[in-house]
């Protein structure tokens, strides 16, 4: 993957545009997400480990909001269940193009990997096939809040018995002091990874109208309302967490 450093917000902007997964972001995305999301590499690699426990023969594994395919690559590294295939979906043309390049590179390096189909499209309009694993890795937070339950209901309907949804998201907190503390610690994390105060402030301005995080309680309530029977948090680092939802 690209090692180009993220300098998108390094220079003062007269007007900060809303964040978008365009070609500029795609070029620096691996660096951006590693330096911005605490625990991201751990979540991605272990998502593959978890998926291997739920994958069922002759079923689909979905990577929804696949970006550059990091989760898809983890699924292919860890899942060895017969007849499985991965469907990776993203609505950014730039992301999809680069994702296909990276996955082709993975194919050339390894044998016996799960087949993968990369689709450019809207996951809200996706025709889901019977699935044993669905990964929503930092994707739901970019979907309009009033459309989230319907999407999760459709995912639940597509899941086979014994399957799982693995949902990773940035969190907000209902307790004001807890929210302020973890927000400050997240800023400290970004500073420690080389982001300037200007970069942090401009990125916050760019993303605040685009990304709408929920609390852990809201995620649990929504997942149960969508038909899931059990919600198990398996990872949290500062204000980022990952959950397993069982049908």
Curated annotation (Swiss-Prot):
GO terms, molecular function: carboxyl- or carbamoyltransferase activity; S-adenosyl-L-methionine binding
BP term (GO), one: tRNA wobble uridine modification
Family: Belongs to the class I-like SAM-binding methyltransferase superfamily. Cx-SAM synthase family.
Entry keyword set: S-adenosyl-L-methionine, Transferase
Catalysed reaction, written as an equation: prephenate + S-adenosyl-L-methionine = carboxy-S-adenosyl-L-methionine + 3-phenylpyruvate + H2O
Gene of this entry: cmoA
Database matches in HAMAP family: Cx_SAM_synthase (MF_01589)
Residue sites binding S-adenosyl-L-methionine per the record: 40, 65-67, 90-91, 122-123, 137, 204
Matching InterPro entries: CmoA, Methyltransf_25, SAM-dependent_MTases_sf
CDD domains: AdoMet_MTases (cd02440)
Function: Catalyzes the conversion of S-adenosyl-L-methionine (SAM) to carboxy-S-adenosyl-L-methionine (Cx-SAM).
Assembly notes: Homodimer.
EC number: 2.1.3.-
Protein's name according to its UniProt entry: Carboxy-S-adenosyl-L-methionine synthase
